[in-house]
Every structure is written in C-alpha cells, then in structure tokens.
Amino acid sequence: MSESGAQQVLARTEARRCLTDIEPRLFPGNGGPDHGEVVEVCGPERTGKTELLYHLLCRCVLPKSAGGLEVDVMFVDTDYSLDMFRLVSIIDSRLTRALSPSAGSDEEVLRSCLSRLLVVHCSSSSQLLLTLHFLENSFSSRPGLALLLIDSISAFYWLDRCEGGASFSKQEEKLSKCSELLGRLLRDYRITVFATCHAIRRIHSGLSSSSFSSSDSDRPYLCRSWQHLVTHRLLCSRQASTAGGSKEQRMRQIFTVHCSSSTGTKAHRISSFHVTDGGVDFT
C-alpha cells in the first residue's frame, strides 16, 4: 500500500465513531464499550438476547433526529434467525414516535435507516472465518461502519466438537482462528462487537483470568481466544412472573440484564426491560 493510501485508511479508521454511549441504561456510567472492545450477550434461551441486539441495532441506524447514532452496522447471522419484518417494525415504530411529519416521508427515512445495515449469513465456523476475512474490505472502506453484531458466536459449538473428535484442541481450532482474526480486526479498524452466546452448562476445574461471570454456572465455556477478547458481559435472565398486580402486569414478561466488565473497573449494573411491539422498553 502506498503512503497516501495508508494515510487514507488511517484517517478513515480514526473517524470511526466510539459507541460508549450506545445504551447508557445497560452499562455503568461512562462504562460502555470503547473502540476495539467486545460485549458478550449471554444467557439461556428466551431471555431477550436477540431482542436486545435489535434494540442496539436500531439505536445505531436511526437518524440523530430520532435519538439514534446514525452509524452503519454489520449483522452476522449464524442462526438464520434474523427477523427482518420484526426489525423493520421496530424501526418504523421508533421513527413514528420520534419524528414530526415535516421530517420527511416515513418510507424515505426508513429506507435511509436500512441502508446502514449490512447482513451476512454463515452456516459453519469455516464460513464464519471466511466471512470475517471478507468483512475486512468493508471495515477499511466504510468509516461509518462502527458496529459488528454476531448472533450467535456459539452457534457451531456442538458441530465443532463433533468434527474435532477426541482432540480438545481440534474441537476449538475453528473458533480460535475466528477469534484471532477478529482480534486483529478490532485492533486495526477500531470497531465494536456485540455477540450473543447461548448458555451451556459445563463444569470447570478453575477460573481463567478473563472469567467475570456472576455465578459458577454462567462461566464462559468457549475457547480461551474468544474469552480473552471479551471486555464486557451482559448476562440475560427472565424474571419469574408475580401473582399480584393487574392482568397486564402479570402477562408482561420482565427480563433482567446484569452487566459486568473485565476492563479493570469494579462497576456493575443491573437493568430490566420488557418487549413490546415497538421493541425493548426499559423499566
């Protein structure tokens, strides 16, 4: 690469927006993810993880006039579960609430929001590795591309274990390579990553240096290369329904998110939300 080309890439990288304010209600004060940091969104099924990703995605692609950050997002769908109808419904609902009729047609603004979203699908760890290689071109050429969402990073865990046979290193080899490449992308392009991780109960003989989960049963189980990348963890759970209150209160499911960090701070935060037709609503 020529000197002028390298300077242009550097300038685009430095212009990438920091996402420490992506959702103040999730993270402790001034404790959101900085450039080059990874947030793992973990928890059992049906605890609001994907809805939380939709919320963060919408927050990024919405215009500033609607309370958004107006940055581009890359969504890597490994579960083939991305619901575009749901996502469009959430964006449209937020635009309707936030914008005045003079701000332009709903369809025009909605199209502008969706133009900031790029979606790719993967069906194996090998495809994920190739996808990350491919994405480097996008990160280098689009300074507005600030957020990478992966739903989920643990999608191929059992498949990789089966293909790896009795060798533990072989079982983790593919995800380790993905994590190492992702680490380089984080350093070189200063993006922010959010990735969901399914809860898998597994007994550990000891804690790694990067383990900062809130209980023994929620310790990380993915490879060390991935664990070393994670700087924040959002542990999602579902509150038990209460017998008291109105019928609406009893029917409305409340989800809880416990935020912890490995960046040297002791700050934690617990937030609650419920899911509406218009997306996540914090309580």
PLM features: what roles do these ranges have?
Residues 1-101:
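The Walker A/P-loop phosphate-binding site
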Residues 21, 57, 61, 98, ...:
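Charged, surface-exposed interaction regions in soluble eukaryotic proteins
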Residues 50, 84, 107, 111, ...:
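Amphipathic alpha-helical transducer elements in NTP-driven molecular machines
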Residues 31-33, 63-69, 98, 110-112, ...:
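Conserved catalytic network of the ASCE P-loop NTPase/AAA+ motor domain
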Residues 38, 149, 195-196:
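Generic enzyme active-site microenvironment
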Residues 172-176, 180, 184-283:
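Phosphate-binding/switch region of NTP-binding enzymes
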Residues 24, 96-108, 206-214, 246-248:
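Intrinsically disordered, low-complexity domain-flanking/linker segments in eukaryotic proteins
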Residues 69-166:
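Conserved inter-motif catalytic segment of the P-loop NTP-binding fold
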